[in-house]
Every structure is written in structure tokens, then in C-alpha cells.
Amino acid sequence: MVKFKQTEEIEKIMTNLEQVRNIGTLAHVDHGKTTLSDSLLLAAGMISPKVAGKALALDYVEIEQLRQMTVKAANVSLYHERGGKPYVINLVDTPGHVDFTGHVTRSLRVMDGAIVVVDAVEGIMTQTETVVRQALEEMVRPLLYINKIDRLIRELRLSPQEVLQRLLNIIKDFNMLIDIHASPSVKNEWKVDPNKGQVAFGAALHKWGFTLPIMQKKGFKFSNIVETYERGGEAIEELARELPLYEAILNMVVDHIPNPKVAQKYRIPKIWKGDLDSEVGRSMLECDPNGPTVLCVSKTIVDPHAGLVATGRVFSGVIYEGETVYLLGAKENGKILQVSLYMGPYREIISRVSAGNIAAVLGLEHARAGETIVDISLKGAMVPFERLRYISEPVVTIAIEPIHSKDLPRLIDTLRKMAIEDPTLRIKINEETGEYLISGMGQLHLEIALWDLNQRTGGLEVKTTPPIVMYRETIRVASKMFEGKSPNKHNRVMFIVEPLNEETLKLLAEGKVFEDQEWRERARILREYADWDADEARGIWAIDEHFNILVDTSKGIQYLKDIKDHIINGFRWCVDEGPLAKEPCRGIKVKLVDAVVHEDPAHRGPAQIIPATKDAIFAGILSARPTLLEPILKIEVKIPQEQIAGVMKALNTRRGKIVSIEQTGYLNIVRGEIPVAETLDLATDMRSLTSGKAFWATEFLKWSPVPENMLHEIIARIRERKGLPPNIPRVVFNPDGSVAIKS
């Protein structure tokens, strides 16, 4: 039996890596991850048996309890005994809703294995596929837990034979995901086999579960479970005593998830691109507590009393109170003021945490998710971890302002803290209107951000606009060369703009090409995989967050290096707010072709170079058949046969497109695409058109050109909302051939 253990005992076991497991729970929304976590906390004695299954203890943010869904990733260290041996299981509970995949991305970095929770009725859903794919990209081993088996018996009234067939289908679908997305080196080994105890079955709400080895050992048959539900009441409670869920899950974790020492050998080459033969490389591969300190931050929160708390995994060395470290991203030294373990919402202070474990540290005010923190001796010699790639990007925005202007400083301060904790939430001030813009992954993301704001400020009164869809500006053809002249007429810059090819956009989206990458490596990748010219690939000056690239293709220009930063600033200014509607640009290559620079520094400052750059780049964009891109979602609907017409109607009336319809047993799966702009009240429609019988989910798919017949109307609407003149700016040629942009 599992007993409650104090922090000191957990601390003792943590140094023996054979007895440590770092795992997370992953799933589609509402498939039962947090309810499963409650059963695991019950095992550790952290919540009472009465409330397990209903407590949602890891959903300790109040809104998570209200909505019954997890919005942030929570951490907890559990104690478990297996075969008379004690183990520490560091558990991360992650959100399943598509709007919160950012939290999942960050959590995966610290895990070695994941329990993927799948609802027995709904099966593998879109989000399940996304999180399994993300896990496999980070070399995190997935195991399967099929939850809510009681629904097959009670709601669908399936016979034991039909239940078995349903479970086998889910296992087959799960293994297919591993076949498609896993690295060839682990593909066969990581497919799950129920006979080996790599799949658990159960009902988290009723706290029972089993693996086939447990079933055989205890002499249970599946028909016994069907009979138990027929009897109901006390019999179900007895089942939870006979087959406790935590035992099935934690035994499966201990037996089939590798310990950190084993896992880091194959995970480090995947998530860290430094020299594996260096001292720090070898130390991380070996998960060596005697090596130099390396901590990768997966999550930051701003504690109202303690300040910024950074949680992450120690990949090498030991992290301890008073240690001086270096933050690679923030490029600064820091001092660790306190080290602790997470026990759900509580932090238990301990003196040190060694390699292979998850720690929370205080004192590093500028640490952010994805930060690499290292021993001070590695300053200047350490390569950071692969950057965290977020599957989606913000596509919906709202404007917010305080009702009372005296509250503005408090609003700004709170929004700043929220953006630190959730890097996928973008906060921006609109200088012209004084509004603050909050952009998120979807409506739910924004609703929860507003609720969070309200809680943190004690009910600060604010005005918000309805959700607005975000667009991107792009071009369809290459422009000719345009010349911009500085206001003092002493400097000239010449640019061409052209669309980036699909291969380049793919490399940018996959994080294989980025701004602060070693330039030779980046040039090689662009030449080999995106057909770039060698000189252009070497001449990249800047890459912005929306995938626009500035390239210097000029030759032998005097004083060019003195104005390089001003040109980069002008480029960023242009692509941050394009000429059509001041929306961010996407997929544009801007080439500096030539320049004439004044010899006197006083005549070539930013006030001269930036306007010239802006005029020439905007002229290029406006002449290259500019258009808007809108965000498109992938939608998957699981529905009984008789309700398919309702789904088709809901999609067809909203510019949606049906990609495929597939029959799986008694449910049909409709897969399609739909613009975000058409989904703002889709839930209501979907409920009424399908009599509430549709299980559906969406996920960001791509940016796609707005239909030509809607383009001008959308541009006009955005310009009006932003208080811009109704007409798009135009290019005016000066007598000397240079250009100016006129409103």
C-alpha cells in the first residue's frame, strides 16, 4: 500500500535515479486527465479518499474547478512503492483544450514519459493526435490509459465482446500514431502491448483501473466489471478497493517509463544541439549530478509573495540555494535564493535538487519558459536548448482598457505578469487608441485571461471589445526595385520584396531556421532544403516572429555597417504593421539591393534611415499584389450517422470545407476546415443542428488567402476599427525616382 511520505523522504530517494520517473498526463479536453491525477494524489495521501475522482486537486486555479478543465500545467512529486522498492514520480498535469497547447509544449520538455488518457467512447481525437505527436518529437515515451469504460457499459450498453472490440480499436489507432510520428529508432519498441501491461483500462471517476497482468494476477474477467455496473452502488466502491486505479497507473509507469539516466541518453541529442563530446554534453547524456549545472525552465509563475518562480528540469549537476548561475536567453547572471519541490499548489522548500529531477527556483526574475540556466563557468560556452515550438499561434484578439484611468498602472503591471506566465498570450499597446490588445489561441484562452486578470486585481473594472480575428498581410508576386530617400535627401536605400517559398515557411514553422542561429548552419539548411541562393542565404540580417526575412544582397557599400541596425528597425516596423490594414506581415522576403550612405554620422541617424527604409519596403509590398491571410482551423466532429447532415450544414454555411467522412463503428468522423472568423458562435449552432450529439474539436491548421470577393470589405472593416483613413496608402514617385507613401 502507498503511504504518505514527507518531503525529506522524497528528497532522499531523488538522488537515486533508478528510482525516479518524470511523467505527465496528456489528452484531449475532458477525457479525464485531472480526474486520473486525483487518484494518483490519493495514493500519495495528498487528498482524502472521499473526494478523489471529484476533487480535481491539480486544477487548483479556481477557474479550472469551475470549468472542470485544466488550463495551466501543474506539478507534483509522488511517492510510490513497487516490489518493496520506493520510487519518486514527478507528475505534470497538462491542459487538453486546444487553446492551451502552449502549456503542453512547455511541460513536455521536463518529462520522459506520458500517460495519454483517451475516452473509451470518443476514442482518439484531434488533440490526442497533436499531443502524442508533440511528445514523440521531444522523445517522450507515451503509454495509454483508456478511461470512462463505464460509459461503454452504462450509456452505450455494449456487450463484453463489443467493449473488447472498442478497446482493441483504440489501441490500434494509438499504435498507428506512434508508427506515423515516432523516430525510427524507437518506433517498434514504443508501440503499446496490453499483454505487457503497457495499457491501463478504467474509470477515473470511480477510482478503479487495471492492466492485463493485474487482471490475470487477481483472477478477474472483463465480464466481472460489466456485472459490477449492473449491481451498482456498493459494488462499484468494492471494485475500486479491489482494483485501485493508482496501482495500475503507477506500476505501469515504474515498469515502462525509463528513469532519467536512461532517457537523457536518447533525449539530449534530440533537444540540445551542442557538442555531445564536451564536458557539459557528456554530463547531460549521463544525467551526472557531479557535472556542471544545467536547468531547462518549462514554466514560470509570478507568486504575489515570493516573486517569479521558475520550474524546470535539472539535466546536469545540482541546483542549490545561493548558487550563482547564468541565464543564456536573458544574457545575465542570477542568484538562486530558494529551491523547492512542488506538491500541487504548495512548494516545499528543500536545500538542493540533483540531475534528473524537477525543481522550482526563486530569485531569477528574468527567467522565462524555454530559458536555459547554467553554471556560471559555462557563460559564453553553452548552447541553449532547442527553442520550444508552439503548435498554434495567437489568432483572436480583444482590446481592453480600465474604466477608471487611475487603474491603468495596475492593469499594465498585471498584464505584464500574465504574459510572463503564458508566453502564448500576447500583450500589445495600441499607441493611437491607448487600448491594450490581448491576443490568444482562441476565445476560451481570452476568457480565461480576463478571469485571471479579474482575480489578480481584486475585480478591477475594465471595458473589453468582442473578440476580433487576427489577419496577416502578404504578397503574391515579386516587386521591382524601389528606392527610399532619407528626409534630409543625403541617403538612399533600394529594396525588392518577394514571397518566401513554402519550403522556407515550413523550416521557419518547424523551428529549423531562426534569427539567432549560427549563420553558416542556417545558410546550409536554406540552400539544401529551400533552394536558396548561396549569397542570399549568407546575407540574412533579421527574421521576425511572423516569418519575414531581411536579406542584404548589396555589394561593397561604404558605411553600410553603421546603418545596419537602423535598416533592421525599419524592416521590423514595416512587417509588424503592414500597409493594407496595419496587421502583421507574413512570408515576405525583403532584399536590400543597394544603398548610398552619407559619410557624416550626423546625417545618417535613425531619423533619416528608418523613414527611407519604410517608404521603399512599403512601396514594394503595395506593388506586389498584396492580400490578407486568415487563420484556418482543422475541425474534427464525431457524430452518429443520422446527425451528419447537421454537421455538413453547420460547416457549409460558414465557408467550411469537408475533407473526409469516415465510419468507425457506431460513430462517423467528419474532418474538415473552417476559418476562425466563422467559428465565433459555432458551438451554439453545432449543438442545435446535431441535437447536442456531436463531439467536436478544432486545431490551428494554416494561414490562407482571404477570398477575393471579401478582401476589400475586410480591409475596410479593420481600417475603420483601428481609426485609419478609409483608403489604403498609395505609392508616389518623386521627380528623382525615389518613392514616398501617401495616405
List the predicted regions and their residue ranges.
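P-loop NTPase switch module centered on the Walker A-proximal segment
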Residues: 1-110, 114-117, 156-159, 165, ...
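P-loop NTPase catalytic nucleotide-binding module
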Residues: 1-29, 127-298, 303
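Structured, non-catalytic alpha/beta "coupling" segments that mediate domain-domain communication
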Residues: 35, 241-262, 358-377
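Short hydrophobic beta-strand that contains or immediately precedes a catalytic carboxylate
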Residues: 91-92, 200-201, 438-439
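Conserved beta-strand segments of the P-loop GTPase G domain that flank and frequently precede/overlap
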Residues: 92, 116-119, 145-147, 399, ...
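A conserved hydrophobic secondary-structure block that centers on an alpha-helix together
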Residues: 94, 115, 120-123, 426-428
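Short glycine-/polar-rich loops that comprise or flank the Walker A/P-loop
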Residues: 110-113, 138-142, 194-197, 395, ...
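Accessory interaction regions appended to the cores of large information-processing enzymes
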Residues: 160, 164, 173-178, 185-189, ...
